[in-house]
């Protein structure tokens, strides 16, 4: 039985950790996760999903604010596991910590590296309208997501997917890929592949500016951005003078000569908006500032000024 220290934080890492806990081939000695954070309107202190799973299974949990030069790092080194496995941990790991693994320190990353190194690979894949994405297991090195590739698996992104659904799918794909890869890695049957630095694409964390959707883009690009920013932080536009979160849109085949942001037509249950390149889309659900999330029917009841030709969406 090989010993593991697992390092992860969000829900993405939970199925991966659970599979290792449930396996008879591995013993999880300890779990390292981010500290408890205050969340929600009530600012309640909440443990990470990974920490909760570890505690449910009686596993030692370490939660350093910063892992480098910490007592928690010393504890991992003391444990001297066969493997250190990370999945969306959220901190850089120093060389001294990586060297504590007797066999290897590896990472489960939510993209097909070298595309989308960084903290938001799944969001960027959806936002950019990629046809597929996947999971990479690679050796950990000091440079971000730059280690040699051990194994990869891919899956398609459909137009019904958003970042939430892809997180779930890639988490399960990562779990299955890891369980398939570890025996080969431990047996020495893996030939790692260096990443092609000329093909590197970065996916830094989403900024506040990126949450504002450019309404002059073609409808299919607007749809990609809406889905890529859902379920959080949710993209926004200024609609009828109010900053409004846009949860769901549908690109249409209908074309128009109207300018982006203008109302094409209003139906009982539909608001059709002009987008870039003569394309159109339908807004399905949204949340104006200071109001609850609502479907378009309820929204239109309070915005009867929106008529064909009206400039419904502006920059501010």
UniProtKB/Swiss-Prot annotation:
Task performed by this protein: Attaches a formyl group to the free amino group of methionyl-tRNA(fMet). The formyl group appears to play a dual role in the initiator identity of N-formylmethionyl-tRNA by promoting its recognition by IF2 and preventing the misappropriation of this tRNA by the elongation apparatus.
Signal sequence annotation: none
Family membership: Belongs to the Fmt family.
SUPFAM superfamilies (alphabetical): FMT C-terminal domain-like, Formyltransferase
Molecular function in Gene Ontology: methionyl-tRNA formyltransferase activity
Keyword Protein biosynthesis included in the entry's annotation: yes
UniProt KW keywords: Protein biosynthesis, Transferase
A Pfam entry, by short name: Formyl_trans_C
Catalytic activity from the UniProt record: L-methionyl-tRNA(fMet) + (6R)-10-formyltetrahydrofolate = N-formyl-L-methionyl-tRNA(fMet) + (6S)-5,6,7,8-tetrahydrofolate + H(+)
Protein name: Methionyl-tRNA formyltransferase
Organism: Limosilactobacillus fermentum (strain NBRC 3956 / LMG 18251) (Lactobacillus fermentum)
GO cellular component, one term: cytosol
PANTHER family linked to this entry: METHIONYL-TRNA FORMYLTRANSFERASE, METHIONYL-TRNA FORMYLTRANSFERASE, MITOCHONDRIAL
